[in-house]
């Protein structure tokens, strides 16, 4: 908050690029999202279940958000952050990272049914926070997108 570079050492675009281009990621380790359309994993996952790097790059250029699930498994700085937070909160902590192209939106309005700590390390985003739509949502509970815009 008002310290743009405070968390810049946690993860960079170059780190994400190195993970995507340098590792043989499988479906589930990387996903794509685009608020403007539904994306199928068939668009960026090959028949063996591996991520098609060229397709990921093309979809990113067209506005898709790159999601690295469990990114702390690939990034020592994120692993250290998770271990520190686990020590502080006595709870399991994991990281998912999101790289969204400028002027794009990865997700439509939604809520998470688990606790989330957001750390934005680069760029700008207008965040909209709403009152709790449901006091204690449970996994799989429906969300009415038109109700929260």
Regions found by a protein language model. Give the residues of each.
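Active-site region of the double-stranded beta-helix
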Residues: 5-9, 17-18, 22-148
